[in-house]
C-alpha cells in the first residue's frame, strides 16, 4: 500500500479527502498505482509510485507526483479506474484544486462539472470575542465515549442534503477520533436550555491551519444566528495557538453559508470541482 501522505505538498490542496483515507485504511476502497517511470534517484532507489488513484463509492480521486507530471500518468490512472469491473468503475471524480491538467482530462473523457467546493480562509483573530450564547444555552467540549450518538444524530439532520458529511457513520467518527489531529476540546457542543444538542463546531488543527471541519445547526433552529455563535466560539478557540490562518470548506452554491462566512472575514483560497461522467 503506498503512503498517500507522501503525495501531500505544502502549496497544493490535499489530493484525497479524509473519508477516502478512512476507507483506504479500512479496506473499503480500490487503490491503483502507477509505478515509478524513472530508473531511480542518484542512489538508484525508486522514489515510489508516480501516481495513485483511489476509487470509493463510485468516486475517483487521483494524484501524480510533481516530478512525474506531464508524462500521461494521470490519463493511465483514469483508464485503469474506468476499466474496473463489477460496477466499481467511477461515475464521479474530484479535482482538488481544479488544475488545468484535471480539466484537460475531464474534457478528454467528456466529464462535466457538477459541484464546486470552495476553501475559504481568514486570519486568526488576535483575541477572541464573546460568542453571544442564547440565554440558557451552554457550550462544552465533546466527550469521547459519551457524545458520539448525540453528535451523529445532529450531524445527519444538519447535513441531510450533503452527500459526504451527512452520511458519516459511527465507524467514520471513531476513525477520526483516532487521527493525530483530533482533540475533543476542538469539537464544541452547543446545548439549549433543555440540554438538547442544538449545534456544534468541529475544528481540525493541523499543519498551521485551523479548519472549521464541520459547523452544524439543528434544522429547527437554523436561521436564528446560531451559526454565527458557533463560528465566533470556534475562532476564539483558535486564538493564541500560533496558526497561520483559519479555513473552511463550503459548497459553491450555498449562498446562506457563504454570506455567513464572508461576514466573518473569510475569502476564497482554493476550489475543488466534482466532475460527472456522461450518461
Locations of regions flagged by a protein language model:
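A short, internal acetyl-CoA/4′-phosphopantetheine-binding micro-motif in the GNAT/acyltransferase core
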Residues: 58-71, 215-222, 251
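Conserved hydrophobic beta-strand within the GNAT/NAT acetyltransferase core sheet
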Residues: 60-62, 91-95, 212, 246-250
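Conserved active-site alpha-helix within GNAT-family acetyltransferase domains
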Residues: 75-76, 97-116, 223-224, 228, ...
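Conserved acetyl-CoA-binding loop-helix of GNAT-fold acetyltransferases
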Residues: 70-84, 217, 223-240, 258-263
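A conserved beta-strand-loop-helix scaffold within acyl/acetyltransferase catalytic domains
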Residues: 20-26, 53-58, 164, 168-216
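Acyl-donor-binding surface of acyltransferase catalytic domains
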Residues: 35-36, 42-43, 49, 56-59, ...
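A short beta-loop-alpha structural element at the N-terminal edge
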Residues: 1-9, 138-153
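C-terminal "cap" of GNAT-fold acetyltransferases
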Residues: 119-143, 247-255, 265, 271-279
Amino acid at each position: 500500500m503506498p503512503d498517500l501522505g507522501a503525495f501531500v505538498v505544502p502549496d497544493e490542496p490535499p489530493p484525497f479527502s479524509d473519508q477516502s483515507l478512512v476507507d483506504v485504511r479500512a479496506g473499503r476502497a480500490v487503490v491503483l498505482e502507477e509505478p515509478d517511470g524513472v530508473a531511480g534517484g542518484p542512489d538508484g532507489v525508486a522514489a515510489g509510485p508516480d501516481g495513485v488513484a483511489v476509487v470509493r463509492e463510485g468516486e475517483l480521486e487521483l494524484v501524480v507526483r510533481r516530478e512525474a507530471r506531464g508524462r500521461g500518468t494521470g490519463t493511465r490512472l483514469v483508464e485503469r479506474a474506468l476499466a474496473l469491473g463489477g460496477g466499481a468503475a467511477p461515475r464521479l471524480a474530484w479535482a482538488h484544486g481544479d488544475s488545468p491538467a484535471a480539466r484537460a482530462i475531464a474534457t478528454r473523457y467528456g466529464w462535466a462539472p457538477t459541484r464546486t467546493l470552495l476553501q475559504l480562509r481568514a486570519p486568526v483573530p488576535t483575541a477572541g470575542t464573546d460568542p453571544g450564547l442564547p440565554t440558557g444555552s451552554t457550550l462544552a467540549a465533546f466527550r469521547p465515549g459519551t457524545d458520539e450518538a448525540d453528535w451523529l444524530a445532529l450531524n445527519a439532520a444538519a447535513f441531510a442534503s450533503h452527500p459526504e458529511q451527512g452520511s458519516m457513520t459511527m465507524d467514520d467518527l471513531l476513525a477520526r477520533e483516532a487521527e493525530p489531529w483530533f482533540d475533543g476540546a476542538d469539537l464544541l457542543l452547543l446545548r439549549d436550555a433543555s440540554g438538547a444538542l442544538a449545534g456544534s463546531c468541529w475544528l481540525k488543527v493541523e499543519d498551521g491551519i485551523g479548519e472549521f471541519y464541520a459547523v452544524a445547526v439543528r434544522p429547527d433552529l437554523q436561521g436564528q444566528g446560531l451559526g454565527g455563535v458557533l463560528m465566533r466560539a470556534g475562532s476564539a478557540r483558535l486564538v493564541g495557538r500560533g496558526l497561520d490562518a483559519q479555513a473552511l470548506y463550503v459548497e459553491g452554491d450555498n449562498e446562506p453559508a457563504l454570506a455567513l462566512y464572508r461576514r466573518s472575514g473569510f475569502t476564497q483560497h482554493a476550489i475543488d470541482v466534482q466532475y460527472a461522467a456522461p450518461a
